[in-house]
Structure formats: C-alpha cells, structure tokens
C-alpha cells in the first residue's frame, strides 16, 4: 500500500519513490526541488503521558492540518515515520 495506515496520507515508501521521480525530473529540466520536513516537538513526552490513543489522534490531526494547507497539484504530504512528516 502507498498510504500510511494510521493517518491515511502517503507513506515513506511512496514518498521515497515520489522524491526520486521528482529529483530526476528536476535534474533533467534544471528546475529546483523544495522539500519541507518536520517533526512534532515533544511528541514522545505527550504520547507517553497521554497514551498511545491520544498520540495517534495527534498524528491524525497533524496529517489533516498539513494536507489541508497543501493545494498545488505537484505537492505531496507524507508521513516519513513516527512523528516525522
């Protein structure tokens, strides 16, 4: 599957394939590639204190918020792993 089971957004495997494809296109066409990666500050502390159910909900909410903010056809939102997007 190309989707993350928890958040429903693109998973790391699909992200890696997409980045490879975009990188090759950028080299071929001499165009830039932009990449933003982030994690959730203090997520481990939150997850440990509030529980995994709350942590999962947090990850889902972040995925939804970021997906809602990205609207260009060539953009991709992916969960890289853990709390990294």
What are these regions (language model features)?
Residues 1-10, 24:
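Amphipathic HAMP/coiled-coil signal-transducing linker helices
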